[in-house]
């Protein structure tokens, strides 16, 4: 398998099981970090930790990547994270970029939309890319990093923890084709999916709301001349009283989601003879005629919006679908999981280095639980709008859609899936509250907006200039710059490395940060703002750094 492999080769690729020296050890070998699950979240976390210098053991109970397209819609923030992990270019080169979409009601186009209406961003709002490609590029990147050891066909079958404390360990028993063996770990990341065995081993569960509806996913390969846009239909003439979603993927594959209703038979609806007339009717509506197609993959699913009460239990942190689940409307599942991984990686790295206390890992749970609640709220609202549960709800929904034909205010009420955006971590204990007045979106807790900048006389992108492994300070150039550079070095002494980056106090970046000469922004390793000042002192920056590290003052 290589970066140039096609979809069939990737899906047919098997990773070889290999016996580990741990299986012959006289006592359980110890690992600083064990990541369980080699999906997009587990692979992203393992790569991030390894790039920070941490040795990672990655376990997966299978020996293949995902089959079928599954998650396909990867958001701008996920692409920016993957840029830092060394796979963003491969993802974007293969993926289908899109920013535009259309919403239909019955026979009519209600309105188009643009998810990236402003210029000055390196990455698009979204790419569509089959999950098996994303996993393949991440697996290839992981194989390039000597600090990652991946063990395929290694299943965690039991987990026990010592009592809480600085020297605590997690004890794991791993089953393989050659029998079980034990290991210990300082920290475990459970990225083992929605049916998480590790969650069950700890006696935990996800709670929330299960939706009584069924949807058919059909991936069809066909040659059609349609724009690269997200098309969503409410009550289309070819599928009355239901909804339909159409997306382009690479390799002339199209993702089509058909709402079926709760009474649909999942096994019957997956049959090609049931799918054929549905796709033919859709193409008749879109093109005026049916087209030949090949059914590549089909699945019928129900879904839930739910999460664990806490994402951290002792020395085990849960990330991705093991911690939270949402409906597919809005592409919030895999995207939020990759953001989980980024949030956890820098904190775990600093804890392992002794640069931050264990308390920093508690903020992984609190911040990502906050993000999960936001995603669940948006996903639930979208699902309620798309699948009204009563006649009154349907009447309200349809009246809103009617208004949206001609009235822009009503379009804000139409919800075909509020698409994934990164969470601004309002209220995080790692944020330093503003003392000065600022405008715009770059508040403490927000992810940094990319933009064109000039560094050392060369044009470049802001996010590409931020350090891969540490904190950074954005200084907007002015007479104070030399003093600020000296002050930053003093403030960070004895804490963590802090990289200064001097930017022009005019231009796109300065506008987005509402910057004046001398404005300073303190950024976390995951590229979130944690503090900002019009005039910063060494005491300000030192205190904000300690706060962002969860170090007691």
Locations of the language-model features?
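Active-site-adjacent segment of FAD-dependent monooxygenases/related oxidoreductases
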Residues: 70-141
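Glycine-rich FAD pyrophosphate-binding loop
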Residues: 50-70
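N-terminal Rossmann-fold NAD(P) dinucleotide-binding loop
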Residues: 42-43
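Helical substrate-recognition/capping region of FAD-dependent monooxygenase/halogenase enzymes
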Residues: 2-36, 51-52, 105-108, 136, ...
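Conserved FAD-binding catalytic core of PHBH/FMO-like flavoproteins
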Residues: 109, 139-140, 187-303
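Core beta-strand elements of the Rossmann-like FAD/NAD(P) dinucleotide-binding domain
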Residues: 29-31, 178-187
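A conserved short coil-to-beta-strand element within the FAD-binding core of flavoproteins
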Residues: 152-170
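FAD/FMN-dependent oxidoreductases across multiple families
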Residues: 10-12, 270-336, 356, 378, ...
């Amino acid at each position: 398998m290589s970066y140039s492999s096609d979809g069939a080769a990737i899906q047919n690729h098997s990773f070889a099981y290999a016996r580990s020296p741990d299986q012959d050890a006289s006592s359980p070998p110890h690992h600083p970090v064990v990541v369980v699950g080699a999906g997009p979240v587990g692979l992203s976390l393992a790569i991030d930790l390894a790039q920070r210098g941490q040795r990672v053991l990655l376990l997966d109970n299978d020996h293949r990547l995902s089959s079928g397209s599954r998650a396909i819609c990867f958001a701008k923030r996920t692409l920016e994270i993957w840029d830092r992990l060394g796979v963003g270019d491969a993802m974007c080169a293969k993926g289908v970029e899109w920013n535009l979409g259309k919403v239909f009601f019955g026979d009519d186009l209600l309105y188009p939309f643009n998810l990236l209406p402003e210029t000055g961003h390196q990455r698009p709002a979204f790419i569509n890319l089959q999950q098996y490609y994303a996993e393949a590029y991440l697996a290839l990147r992981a194989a390039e990093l000597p600090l990652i050891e991946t063990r395929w066909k290694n299943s965690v079958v039991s987990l026990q923890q010592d009592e809480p404390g600085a020297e605590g360990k997690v004890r794991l028993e791993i089953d393989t084709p050659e029998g079980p063996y034990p290991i210990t770990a300082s920290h475990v990341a459970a990225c083992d999916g929605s049916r998480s065995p590790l969650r069950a081993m700890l006696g935990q569960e996800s709670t929330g709301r299960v939706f009584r509806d069924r949807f058919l996913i059909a991936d069809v390969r066909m040659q059609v001349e349609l724009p690269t846009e997200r098309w969503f239909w409410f009550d289309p003439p070819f599928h009355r009283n239901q909804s339909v979603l159409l997306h382009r993927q690479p390799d002339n594959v199209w993702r089509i989601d058909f709402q079926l209703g709760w009474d649909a038979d999942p096994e019957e609806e997956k049959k090609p003879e049931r799918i054929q007339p549905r796709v033919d009717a859709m193409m008749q509506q879109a093109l005026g005629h049916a087209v030949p197609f090949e059914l590549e993959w089909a699945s019928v699913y129900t879904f839930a919006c739910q999460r664990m009460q806490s994402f951290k239990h002792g020395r085990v942190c849960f990330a991705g679908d093991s911690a939270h689940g949402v409906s597919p409307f809005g592409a919030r599942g895999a995207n939020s999981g990759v953001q989980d991984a980024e949030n956890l990686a820098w904190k775990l790295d600093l804890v392992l280095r002794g640069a931050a206390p264990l308390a920093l890992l508690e903020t992984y749970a609190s911040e990502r639980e906050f993000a999960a609640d936001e995603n669940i709220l948006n996903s639930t609202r979208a699902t309620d709008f798309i699948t009204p549960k009563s006649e009154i709800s349907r009447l309200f929904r349809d009246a809103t859609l009617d208004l949206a034909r001609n009235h822009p205010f009503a379009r804000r009420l139409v919800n075909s899936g509020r698409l994934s955006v990164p969470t601004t971590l309002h209220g995080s204990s790692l944020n330093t509250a503003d003392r000065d007045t600022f405008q715009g979106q770059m508040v403490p807790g927000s992810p940094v907006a990319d933009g064109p900048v000039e560094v050392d006389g060369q044009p470049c992108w802001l996010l590409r200039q931020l350090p891969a492994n540490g904190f950074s300070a954005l200084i907007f150039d002015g007479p104070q710059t030399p003093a600020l550079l000296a002050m930053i070095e003093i403030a960070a002494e004895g804490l963590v490395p802090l990289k200064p980056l001097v930017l022009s106090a005019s231009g796109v970046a300065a506008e987005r940060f509402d910057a004046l000469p001398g404005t300073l922004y303190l950024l976390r390793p995951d590229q979130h703002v944690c503090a900002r000042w019009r005039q910063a002192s060494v005491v300000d920056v030192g205190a904000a750094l300690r706060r962002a590290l969860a170090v007691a003052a």
